[in-house]
A protein has these predicted regions:
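Small-residue hotspots at the loop-to-helix junctions and early N-terminal turns
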Residues: 43-56, 135, 194, 266-281, ...
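Short alpha-helical transmembrane segments in multi-pass integral membrane proteins
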Residues: 1-18, 76-143, 185-241, 297-362, ...
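Small-residue-rich hydrophobic transmembrane alpha-helices
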Residues: 48-108, 145-164, 258, 271-335, ...
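Helix-terminus/linker motif at the lipid-water interface of multi-pass membrane proteins
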Residues: 26, 30-49, 118-125, 181-188, ...
């Protein structure tokens, strides 16, 4: 099941790895969009806001866990690249032990704090009940959400991006079917959306485990590999914690933006909730390129192929920037129709169009720093990604959105500019960091 990513044409290797990952990401976004579509058809602005706020909160938790799992992807990738499968087995076993413990504790804490979380994000009164119900159900499912994303991280470290695609395809089908049942037929609203999401994630974990056991591989995780080993856990956390914190900070910034929008009223709150969900969908390519760069670079770094690793970064970044330019032009042309497909309320469509047309420029600049962050993480330098993201959030994304929202109360267009400006700062920092480290030969060999 493991795949050698250290040979062959770089661009072709990127495409072969990235395309299944993109499809997996698309399918994950699809059933998130299905939730919003069904809520828009059967529930109205209050339901959209409840699911939008709840999904944004859950996404913070999910991406933080995924970021932490980056340590596993990189360590497993290093081991596969150097053909040390015993190290990969130990890393996988320790990851399972670590994340299952963390996810159970996290679920319990979040359930206890659910009312406070709903209040903290400034949920409009009309959407409080629905948001709380959505979050309680999703918090119960956190161990399953964590398990799926951990398994995906392990697959990527092994160079396999296809297996998660097959698994998530089944989960997506289940989720969409349940949305029609729970939201459309039974009228359960946000509760139905949450039940569909958690049930689909649970099914995906079960299927992934069955798939993993059925595949022939050089990796055989034994019970002894589950025993925590401080050195292994330290290696995983050294890479994963900065990535988790940086991803968490980005999502917290989005949550602050959601809070700002919530204080503007129900229409703007619904518009921002819709656009944020759509942006996740439109960012499939740069997000996929970031994961692709980390997986390919990890194996090539483990194999001592620094030049090939740098070529991976260059090609992936080119793909991301070209995509960003194309999608920006497209959204300027079709934003009203695109948003109108998910919302019938004309006021929500108008507000969302303005927000989308400024926010979408982020697709260009985010593609640059996401690829750099994946590259830095693969070389054990994930602290760089942490630093530039925290600076962008603290200096531009949040304060910029707040200031522009207050200055322009009649439109969301200026508020949307804050995100691409934050990504511009991140991109500049990444270019400087790469140039300095590359001149010092930091990417010529792997330093564990």
């Amino acid at each position: 099941m493991e795949h050698d990513l250290t040979h062959g044409n770089v661009l072709k290797t990127i495409a072969v790895f990235a395309l299944p990952y993109m499809l997996s990401y698309f399918l994950q976004m699809l059933y998130g969009m299905a939730d919003l579509y069904m809520m828009g058809q059967f529930s109205g602005a209050a339901g959209i806001t409840a699911v939008g706020n709840g999904a944004q909160t859950l996404y913070i938790i999910t991406v933080t866990l995924v970021g932490l799992a980056m340590g596993t992807t990189v360590i497993v990738g290093h081991a596969v690249g150097s053909r040390r499968f015993d190290r990969a087995e130990t890393a996988i076993g320790n990851t399972i032990t670590l994340f299952m413990g963390v996810s159970v504790v996290l679920a319990a804490v979040l359930l206890a704090l659910c009312p406070q979380i709903v209040a903290l994000i400034g949920t409009p009164p009309e959407a409080v009940e629905g948001t709380a119900a959505y979050l309680r159900i999703c918090f119960v499912g956190i161990p399953f959400i964590a398990a799926y994303n951990i398994l995906s991280a392990i697959f990527r470290g092994l160079g396999d991006s296809r297996s998660p695609m097959y698994v998530i395809g089944v989960a997506c089908t289940i989720n969409i079917a349940l949305d029609f049942l729970f939201i459309g037929h039974m009228g359960l609203g946000p509760v139905g959306a949450a039940l569909g999401t958690v049930t689909a994630q649970t099914a995906s974990v079960a299927l992934a485990l069955v798939w993993l056991k059925s595949r022939r591989t050089n990796i055989h995780v034994m019970r002894s590999d589950l025993r925590p080993q401080p050195e292994v856990l330290s290696s995983i956390l050294k890479i994963g914690v900065p990535v988790a914190v940086q991803d968490g900070c980005i999502q917290v910034a989005f949550m602050f933006i959601t809070v700002i929008a919530n204080h503007r009223g129900l229409v703007d709150a619904a518009a921002v909730g819709l656009v944020e969900k759509m942006i996740s969908f439109l960012f499939i390519v740069p997000s996929s390129m970031g994961a692709t760069v980390s997986a390919l670079t990890a194996q090539n770094a483990g194999a001592g192929k620094g030049n090939r690793a740098r070529q991976v970064l260059k090609d992936a970044m080119t793909i991301s920037v070209v995509h960003g330019c194309l999608i920006t032009v497209l959204m300027w042309l079709v934003a009203p129709a695109f948003i109108g497909f998910f919302a019938k309320d004309a006021a929500v469509v108008a507000a969302g169009t303005g927000y989308m047309r400024s926010y979408i420029f982020d697709a260009i600049f985010a593609g640059i720093h996401i690829c750099f962050s994946g590259f830095f993480a693969a070389y054990g330098k994930s602290y760089i990604g942490f630093a530039h993201n925290v600076l962008a959030v603290a200096l531009i994304r949040v304060p910029g959105a707040w200031l522009l929202s207050n200055a322009y109360s009649d439109t969301l267009f200026p508020m949307g500019i804050a995100s691409p400006c934050g990504s511009m700062l991140s991109a500049v920092i990444c270019v400087i960091a790469f140039t300095v480290l590359n001149r010092r030969g930091a990417f010529d060999k792997l330093v564990a």
